[in-house]
Amino acid sequence: MATKHRNLSQLNSPLPSAEEMKFGIVVAEWNPEVTEGLLSGAVHTLRSAGCPEHNIQIKYVPGTFELALGAQFFAEYTDVDAVIALGCVIQGDTRHFDFICQGVTQGITQLQIQWNMPIAFGVLTVGDMQPVSYTHLRA
């Protein structure tokens, strides 16, 4: 069934244990009203899966375009098991949106292949702020 016909917020599958895992979370500083909510939700989910707080490292980068560089830092210089990349790109009147979205998508994909490490793509790409205005409530 197509996901547009399912309320994915209502999915309730059990989380695997993250007790022994280490995570890096890289967060874009641009659109902090959105990315801070995404960060809160990610940390809450990891903690709910048993990940100790000391096994969660958080780094900030200026914008969504730089998420790949932040993820590479975690892959290359730390011992994390996985990375979560969080950002938000809001479409404007220029093609800048397309360039940023394409760049971060390709960058993160290449890093997963290069480092053989899962990098969760938590980047919202939206036409305006309305669809993301509730993210701070989704912890």
Which role does the model predict for each range below?
Residues K22-E29, K59, A85-Q91:
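Short glycine-rich or small-residue beta-strand-to-loop segments that form or flank ligand, phosphate
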Residues T135-A139:
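Conserved small/polar residues in nucleotide/adenosyl-binding loops
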